[in-house]
């Protein structure tokens, strides 16, 4: 009892303007930075999922590729969440993009540069000042290697895919920070999900290629000479059959045209194409089986005899 009385007495002896625990009315309440349950560190650019769980933006990005579900409650993540995330502190993104004149690290994207998040940028700067040749970074669940001699980055298990990096001041023009676009680029953001773990928009090339019209090449009409010429010959009139054969031959031989036409030019007209001699065309148009036509075929073959081998007129 005495102890309690002493404590009460000592507390009552304090001045009235001083208390044991007195919050400062003028100071803003300190907001503790939440911890990420994926990387087990303090959140960098924390985002809140529809299920109210909070993670780093890049951690959510990496986890969504595996199953597109929350890492804690397994609730489904919306399809457009990575393009329109719910940031807990948007002013933090603005301050990180502006900086105070110090240096920052960037990785190359399509049509611009992305700034690393603050934690990764500090790790790169620390390795650079210590003179290290390379360092490893954990970004969106993937382990990357930063080659500080050649200024490139690549995944540790995939050396073929490389991306340029650089060290520059914070105030240079940029696309965004850690895959989060700035407000100036919000109107131009593509709703398609970006396919790179570090925020590079590789899907823009697919959209540009799909917007270009695909040329349609016209097809040539191939004419079969053997079938047409065989039906064109008449037993009664050899002259008319020759005229019909020449009419069919003027359409064009696919073999001749194929030799003169280049790749992708099948629909263009032939220019300066050399036509074969009439005797050769007649030989090609002649049917292989001469037994079906009888004597008219023999008369037709006599027309193909060279002039030097013919007998003069009047000699039997």
Swiss-Prot record:
Xref: PROSITE patterns: WWE, ZF_RING_1, ZF_RING_2
SUPFAM superfamilies attached to this UniProt entry: RING/U-box, WWE domain
CDD domains, per the entry: RING-HC_RNF146
GO cellular component, one term: nucleus
EC code(s) of this entry: 2.3.2.27
Pathway(s) of this molecule: Protein modification; protein ubiquitination
Cell compartments where the protein resides: Cytoplasm, Cytosol; Nucleus
Superkingdom of source: Eukaryota
Zinc finger (RING-type) boundaries: 36-74
Main localization, broad class: cytoplasm
GO molecular function, one term: ubiquitin protein ligase activity
Comment field on protein domains: The WWE domain mediates non-covalent poly(ADP-ribose)-binding.
Described function: E3 ubiquitin-protein ligase that specifically binds poly-ADP-ribosylated proteins and mediates their ubiquitination and subsequent degradation. May regulate many important biological processes, such as cell survival and DNA damage response. Acts as an activator of the Wnt signaling pathway by mediating the ubiquitination of poly-ADP-ribosylated proteins. Neuroprotective protein. Protects against cell death induced by DNA damaging agents and rescues cells from G1 arrest. Promotes cell survival after gamma-irradiation. Facilitates DNA repair.
Protein name: E3 ubiquitin-protein ligase rnf146
Primary gene name: rnf146
